[in-house]
Amino acid sequence: MSRVSQARNLGKYFLLIDNMLVVLGFFVVFPLISIRFVDQMGWAAVMVGIALGLRQFIQQGLGIFGGAIADRFGAKPMIVTGMLMRAAGFATMGIAHEPWLLWFSCFLSGLGGTLFDPPRSALVVKLIRPEQRGRFFSLLMMQDSAGAVIGALLGSWLLQYDFRLVCATGAILFILCALFNAWLLPAWKLSTVRTPVREGMRRVMSDKRFVTYVLTLAGYYMLAVQVMLMLPIMVNDIAGSPAAVKWMYAIEACLSLTLLYPIARWSEKRFRLEHRLMAGLLVMSLSMLPIGMVGNLQQLFTLICAFYIGSVIAEPARETLSASLADARARGSYMGFSRLGLAIGGAIGYIGGGWLFDMGKALAQPELPWMMLGIIGFITFLALGWQFSHKRTPRRMLEPGA
């Protein structure tokens, strides 16, 4: 086996272990934020939405800067620094009793993510061969789902005792992850050339096809981020207990572990990437529309199940498209900018979703936020269809297995 092949194989295992630690650390804390501050402390949902939206926008919106810096200086220092910064954010969150302190903790958490997320994504593109990326992204997403359930279960159990224990556990996991990277991650370059920060950013911004694709996905992310805000609140409201939230993540894990990889393997040779992305988005949009009208957990979990199936269909295609469009001369910059749609959509989804949720309660129209999200999903579906027309998008990007 050549040294390059050996490095790729070892790199796969490193990426999987690293991803599991990051997912566990994140999901121990973040799914419980809305329950802690809205249901337990009585804050308005929009206040928590601002905090979550701020974290999302800082992490993803500034990702191009984190990626460009990683292109210049390498992945390792950015990843280690970012993970320690997120640990500090979680520690601060544990003592947050005023909105400004929660916002500051989410700012720290997001800034840490800005530093470590783009280089981690670029390492996947660097270490995984193009023909294997779709399946590897599916494995990562299966791992994300399992880690989400384990993290949410652990966080829900700790929340019975003290929210500070929840935050301390998340912080410890990110400190462990920082040590793991500091010890084992080689000083790899992300790009084929050591690209200056400004040059990497310029290269991305001049790629109109990539920019359009990323910005169009903002509507997709407005729906996707509700698993952290409105869906946990809805489950808690109907069940009357935050313990029921763990079953929401259990549903996601079961569906992902049983369906994600088989669907990706089966569909990659039969359907074009844009068809898979759009089909998943359509299912997600349809499942959102009736959520505000359900009256029991069985109905709600059925719709959540449909939402997750849509995500299982869409996510591998979305990640593969983003990776396939990245210029090898500026991988970090491209993968950082690819998060901008999540920054915009996530911020609007959290803040706007929280505001609509409060408004729906005030007007006695609980279906209002869910109807709006469904409509946004349909608009995004049409926008993607327009973008993916043959007149606008090169065929190579869309072929099965691309």
Curated annotation (Swiss-Prot):
Q: Which GO terms describe its cellular component?
A: plasma membrane
Location relative to the cell: Cell inner membrane
- InterPro entries, alphabetically? MFS, MFS_dom, MFS_trans_sf, MFS_Transporters, Multidrug-R_MdtH
Which keywords appear in this protein's UniProt record, sorted alphabetically?
Answer: Cell inner membrane, Cell membrane, Membrane, Transmembrane, Transmembrane helix, Transport
Q: Which HAMAP family match?
A: MFS_MdtH (MF_01529)
Q: Which family does it belong to?
A: Belongs to the major facilitator superfamily. DHA1 family. MdtH (TC 2.A.1.2.21) subfamily.
Question: Can you name this protein?
Answer: Multidrug resistance protein MdtH
Q: Which organism is it from?
A: Salmonella newport (strain SL254)
